[in-house]
């Protein structure tokens, strides 16, 4: 996913005008590089353009270029999700109509399936065979709109509203950081925001975490669970939940709540747990990441299996509500351990790292996009067992913004 943390106005596109869907008549294959990996790349020396879509057959060696390859998308900001063996590319329209373009891979090449007119949402996740999308208000008193998109039919099959203003019970409104399917329910962690008063994303309640639990597919609110040991879960447009093979759900807090533009949480960046089959925080589990890492806070993570997460982190000096950390480490939530990854480029040479990365979920491996300040871009293979990073595929012509596989 493109680095949404650098600009809080970034959001994802939602399918709104299904009647305006247009099928690609020729269903032409559009990528010259065969392979089931999909890399999105923002071209160098270009402004106001969206990512190129490139395919590759491996991430560990070779060179891939935007020159004469891939698909140039329209629009500016794009966000991505893969589910049901399809790749969804979603345009954020910035006040104009957006689009959702759907692809699959045939014989190692991207093939366009459909294109939909859109509007803007701020949280989304695969649930069963659907994409669940939620448009979240930033003004107190307004309701959130949800949409269920059937990923076989590429149709909206159900929609409704959520009363986010009454979730908090404290006079502020709830803003979901993300959505996650947990068994047959949808967990929606949220932060409490004023949504007014020249402090829209500020809060008077910085030291609590909440998760709204919804039935699926009815989206009926079942309960709200709360934990006062951390600040809110995840961050704006960042998935702060990870579900293990045994069904346990882990949650990270960055501790980046603000009041009046100033960090106000007294809680450290930490990890908590909701045990499988329950809808309560486990008060016997708490992992103080800030202490374990020598004072850093988690900004993103990706679950790779076996209790291991690859995490991005920032130091206290680098801390920001929308900053993506360039310090890479391995967290094992079972053992409550943190190991810094070696082999990454020097920190002062890194321009950006991708938020949306790929893992085969083998308990060991993740692939992360890194773009250096000199403009060169590479995929790095992260080995959780050895806590090392190895430079792999070189990408010429732009900044890597996401890595996926179909």
Residue ranges and their predicted role:
Residues 52-57, 100-102, 143-154, 201-220, ...:
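Beta-propeller blade signature
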Residues 61-74, 109-119, 155-171, 220-229, ...:
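Beta-propeller fold detector
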Residues 71-84, 116-129, 168-179, 231-241, ...:
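Repeated scaffold domains used in trafficking and secretory/extracellular systems
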Residues 51-155:
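Post-signal peptide N-terminal segment of secreted/secretory-pathway proteins
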Residues 33-45, 83-93, 128-140, 185-192, ...:
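Short beta-strand elements that form the blades of beta-propeller/WD-repeat-like
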Residues 180-317:
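Acidic, serine/threonine- and glycine-rich low-complexity intrinsically disordered segments
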Residues 1-39:
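Bacterial Sec-dependent N-terminal signal peptides
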Residues 279-375:
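Intrinsically disordered, low-complexity segments enriched in Gly and acidic/Ser/Thr residues
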């Amino acid at each position: 996913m493109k680095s949404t943390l650098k600009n809080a106005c970034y959001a994802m596109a939602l399918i709104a005008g299904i009647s305006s869907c247009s099928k690609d008549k020729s269903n032409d294959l559009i990528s010259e590089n065969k392979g089931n990996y999909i890399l999105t790349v923002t071209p160098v020396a270009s402004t106001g353009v969206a990512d190129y879509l490139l395919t590759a057959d491996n991430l560990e060696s070779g060179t891939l270029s935007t020159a004469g390859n891939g698909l140039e998308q329209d629009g500016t900001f794009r966000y991505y999700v893969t589910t049901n063996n399809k790749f969804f590319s979603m345009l954020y329209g910035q006040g104009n109509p957006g689009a959702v373009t759907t692809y699959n891979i045939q014989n190692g090449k991207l093939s366009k399936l459909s294109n939909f007119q859109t509007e803007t949402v701020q949280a989304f996740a695969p649930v069963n065979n659907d994409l669940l999308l939620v448009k979240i208000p930033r003004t107190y008193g307004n309701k959130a709109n949800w949409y269920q998109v059937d990923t076989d039919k590429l149709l909206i099959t159900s929609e409704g509203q959520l009363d986010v203003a009454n979730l908090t019970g404290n006079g502020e409104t709830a803003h979901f950081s993300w959505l996650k399917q947990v068994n047959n329910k949808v967990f929606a962690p949220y932060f409490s925001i004023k949504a007014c008063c020249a402090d829209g994303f500020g809060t008077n309640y910085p030291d609590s975490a909440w998760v709204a639990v919804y039935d699926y597919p009815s989206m009926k609110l079942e309960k709200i669970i709360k934990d006062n040991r951390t600040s809110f879960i995840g961050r704006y447009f960042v998935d702060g939940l990870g579900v293990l093979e045994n069904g346990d759900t882990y949650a990270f807090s960055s501790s980046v709540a603000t009041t009046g533009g100033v960090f106000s949480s007294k809680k450290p960046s930490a990890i908590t747990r909701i045990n499988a089959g329950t809808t309560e925080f486990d008060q016997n589990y708490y992992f103080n990441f800030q202490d374990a890492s020598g004072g850093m806070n988690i900004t993103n993570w990706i679950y790779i299996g076996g209790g291991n997460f690859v995490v991005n982190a920032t130091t206290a000096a680098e801390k920001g509500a929308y900053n993506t950390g360039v310090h890479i480490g391995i967290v094992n939530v079972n053992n409550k351990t943190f190991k810094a990854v070696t082999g990454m480029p020097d920190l002062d040479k890194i321009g950006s790292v991708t938020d949306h990365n790929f893992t085969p979920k083998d308990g060991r491996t993740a692939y992360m996009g890194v773009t250096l300040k000199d403009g060169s871009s590479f995929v790095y293979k992260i080995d959780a067992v050895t806590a090392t990073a190895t430079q792999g595929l070189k990408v010429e012509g732009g900044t890597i913004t996401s890595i996926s596989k179909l």
